[in-house]
Amino acid sequence: MIEGRYWRRWVFFYVPVTAFVVALLFPFYWMIVTSVRPDKELYRPWNAANYAPFWTLHPTFEHVRDLLTQTLFGTWMLNTMIISLSATVISLFCGLLAGYALSRLRFRFAGLIGTGIFITYLVPQTLLFIPLSDIIRNFKLGDSPWALILTYPTFLIPFCTWLLMGYFKSIPKELEECARIDGAPRWKAMLYIIFPVALPGILSAGIFAFTLSWNEFIYALVFLSSPEQKTIPVGVTSELVRGDVFYWGELMAGALLGSIPVAFVYSFFVEYYVSGITGSVKG
């Protein structure tokens, strides 16, 4: 019986988990191998002698060097960081206030308004970038970071509000009521009691907003045109693909280096992210 349980555990747990992990990590492995593979191996026919598709025989960093010296990758990285952090701060500020008001204050149609805010998040971006581009053109913000800093919150604020609403609802109201009884105004109770308790939810909303801003492509492609203003997703794909020529080594190096900040954020705040998501769902 013990042996049967052992095999069932392998068949129904270890094998699926192993397959899932391999499928999840293989793209990153492929990016690493391609970024350090010399050109003579990248374009070698599959039936050639000593052909090794899953590893390289002569690793080199020439593609990383060319990416950093012959392109504006450093500028793209800085632009992406500034835009992502700015959009995240704006979205968190508005989402905190809206989520607190809709979950902790009593007024008519609060639930209906919260549902409406989340529905706006479900609207496809392809339907919004045309009117948004008209607004950006009227305010003369085209081809500038402000075009993205002011448009990203249009889809980040609804989700942050919905996520924080669920987390605020899971916090006992007695904590806030005790502070109010002791004479603290509502804004102090919110700032010094509710927000510290809701820190996992706030961090999870911030991680989501930062990741989505970092990887966003459609708005950055439409609103930014000059190479000096582009973000990493647009800069790498537009400057390293010329006609029908794909610079695969530089492309994979750019994708790999561009994913480091997001991986760094998730690795340090993954516990807060998971607890924030589960807390919001439970609420």
Locations of regions flagged by a protein language model:
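A structural signal for multi-pass alpha-helical bundles of membrane permease subunits
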Residues: 2-283
